[in-house]
Amino acid sequence: MRYEVLTQTLPDNFDWRKQKVVTEVKDQGKLDVSDVFAVVGAIESCWAIRTGNLNTLSEQQLVDCGRNETSANLREVFESVSSLGGLAPNSSYPYVAQHQQCKLNKTEISVRIEGHLKMHNEEAMARYLMAKGPFVVAFNGKDSLASYKGGIVNFNSTQCPPTKLSQAGLVVGFGVEAKMPFWILKNSRGGKWGENGYFRIARGSNTCGIASNVYSPFFDVDIGGPNIFVAM
């Protein structure tokens, strides 16, 4: 792989939903699998950006075949996608919100990834988002979203310790409201939760650990061109 320097000027607002490359908000139900939904969402969106094909992919495949139920282990979920050879469509392996025996037919896999990369810096995250697509984050969801109805989550590190990563989400955009920068995240609690299934959280100060555990997929179409980045 080669390195790409991302130096584009950041606008005040950017949202991949406007480009029709984000699938509808899903509902994980009773299972603690927000990391699975976030990773699948990132693969769906990033694949759509690269190919023009927005496919709804299977979370149930990862629940059944991928890894044990945990709270926010993003790297392990990406590794499961790679080891299984990719993801099947949701239509062939639909979500049922419970654990089953693995039923994966590998001939049905429709999207494969080459691997995943990790980010740290929120400036780099914003530049990457614009250049490459949505990515997944782990954060302290217990303290940040317990009573969320809308608005921008903006707690200090005492109110929402950044080391207690308990949930994952898909970052699809960013913006500024009343001089407060924020991230836009897709949750997996259905479209009636929060702001039509999404929530906003303060950007620039690692609020609730939002910049502590950040990953994105990359694909075979990225190989041969620059796909690891340095933000300036």
Predicted segments with their positions:
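Catalytic-core signature of thiol
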Residues: 1-232
